[in-house]
Curated annotation (Swiss-Prot):
<feature type="region of interest" description="Disordered">
    <location>
        <begin position="1"/>
        <end position="48"/>
    </location>
</feature>
<dbReference type="Pfam" id="PF14144">
    <property type="entry name" value="DOG1"/>
</dbReference>
<keyword id="KW-0804">Transcription</keyword>
<dbReference type="GO" id="GO:0005634">
    <property type="term" value="C:nucleus"/>
</dbReference>
<dbReference type="GO" id="GO:0003700">
    <property type="term" value="F:DNA-binding transcription factor activity"/>
</dbReference>
<dbReference type="GO" id="GO:0006351">
    <property type="term" value="P:DNA-templated transcription"/>
</dbReference>
<dbReference type="InterPro" id="IPR004827">
    <property type="entry name" value="bZIP"/>
</dbReference>
<comment type="similarity">
    <text>Belongs to the bZIP family.</text>
</comment>
<dbReference type="Pfam" id="PF00170">
    <property type="entry name" value="bZIP_1"/>
</dbReference>
<dbReference type="InterPro" id="IPR025422">
    <property type="entry name" value="TGA_domain"/>
</dbReference>
<feature type="domain" description="DOG1">
    <location>
        <begin position="111"/>
        <end position="329"/>
    </location>
</feature>
<feature type="region of interest" description="Basic motif">
    <location>
        <begin position="46"/>
        <end position="66"/>
    </location>
</feature>
<feature type="compositionally biased region" description="Basic and acidic residues">
    <location>
        <begin position="34"/>
        <end position="47"/>
    </location>
</feature>
<keyword id="KW-0539">Nucleus</keyword>
<keyword id="KW-0175">Coiled coil</keyword>
<feature type="domain" description="bZIP">
    <location>
        <begin position="44"/>
        <end position="107"/>
    </location>
</feature>
<protein>
    <recommendedName>
        <fullName>Transcription factor HBP-1b(c38)</fullName>
    </recommendedName>
</protein>
Length: 332
């Protein structure tokens, strides 16, 4: 019984030590619980931030979608306005009709038809010139020569008529001389030869000429030069006027607005009207060429007229030959 007491003491001491350690355990538990709550709180904050970011991203996405839809709507309205303006312009005769593609096709066919007709004309012209050359070399009489000369002059009238018809389909094709060889185009003036230059060439090739003939050719050359200058000045004025019309509203802001569309259509209508005078310029130039040939025939004798036609033909033939030689030259 005496030995039992120390064990009891020891047991009591252990109990006391355990009791003394219990506050520490409680503190550790408190710290652990606080840490858990802090982690939960931080996790909640991160979640809230992510939710806020998602809401902001969704809001911006909705705004972008709304702006895109509005842009599409504005574009649709602007397109509708343009279509209405174009429709009104067509009804008023300001704009080219909806058959523009068909007109372009007809224009292209007209140019092609003229090129074909010109090739046939040139073939027949060369045949007639060879006939005239043979008659001159054979010292044929004036009656025979006059018959061939008149035939060639009538043949020239035919090409002038064909050019006039072709110009109605495509005046640019005829005016630019696309139906000629490159070398011929270099010397082209308003879709053909320059009458004053032709007379200058003939005056040196038809000697001897009487004083009356020289005076007649000189006067014809001066009048032709004056007419050429007037037509050239008219073409320059037309080009300047066209440039001013087309450049009228370039660079203006809000090009899609209704007012600017109407202004654009009006300017195109003015430009189209001015381009319509090109056919008139070409017609006047061809009339001058035709009259020059006729006046030349009146001034010269039949034999001189025959020689003049041969000179004109030989000069044109040499230009065509020059084009062929140039195109066939060795390329380095």
């Amino acid at each position: 019984m005496a030995e039992a007491s120390p064990r009891t003491e020891t047991s009591t001491d252990d109990t006391d030590e355990n009791l003394m350690l219990e506050p520490g355990n409680a503190a550790l538990a408190v710290v652990s619980d606080s840490s858990d709550r802090s982690r939960d709180k931080n996790g909640d904050q991160k979640t809230m931030r992510r939710l806020a970011q998602n809401r902001e991203a969704a809001r911006k996405s909705r705004l972008r979608k709304k702006a895109y839809v509005q842009q599409l709507e504005n574009s649709r309205l602007k397109l509708t306005q343009l279509e209405q303006e174009l429709q009104r312009a067509r009804q008023q005769g300001i704009f080219i009709s909806s058959s523009a593609d068909q007109s372009h096709s007809m224009s292209g066919n007209g140019a092609l038809a003229f090129d074909t007709e010109y090739a046939r004309w040139l073939e027949e012209h060369n045949r007639q010139v060879n006939e005239l050359r043979a008659a001159v070399n054979a010292h044929a009489g004036d009656t025979e020569l006059r018959s061939v000369v008149e035939k060639i002059m009538s043949h020239y009238d035919e090409i002038f008529k064909q050019k006039g018809n072709a110009a109605k389909a495509d005046v640019f094709h005829v005016l630019s001389g696309m139906w000629k060889t490159p070398a011929e185009r270099c010397f082209l003036w308003l879709g053909g030869f320059r009458p004053s230059e032709l007379l200058k060439l003939l005056s040196t090739q038809l000697e001897p000429l009487t004083e009356q003939q020289l005076s007649g050719i000189c006067n014809l050359q001066q009048s032709s030069q004056q007419a050429e200058d007037a037509l050239s000045q008219g073409m320059e004025a037309l080009q300047q006027s066209l440039a001013e019309t087309l450049a009228g509203s370039i660079g203006s802001s809000g090009s899609g607005s209704t007012g600017n569309v109407a202004n654009y259509m009006g300017q195109m209508a003015m430009a189209m009207g001015k381009l319509g005078t090109l056919e008139n310029f070409l017609s006047q130039a061809d009339n001058l060429r035709q009259q020059t040939l006729q006046q030349m025939q009146r001034i010269l004798t039949t034999r001189q007229s025959a020689r003049a036609l041969l000179v004109i033909s030989d000069y044109s033939s040499r230009l065509r030959a020059l084009s062929s030689l140039w195109l066939a030259r060795p390329k380095e």
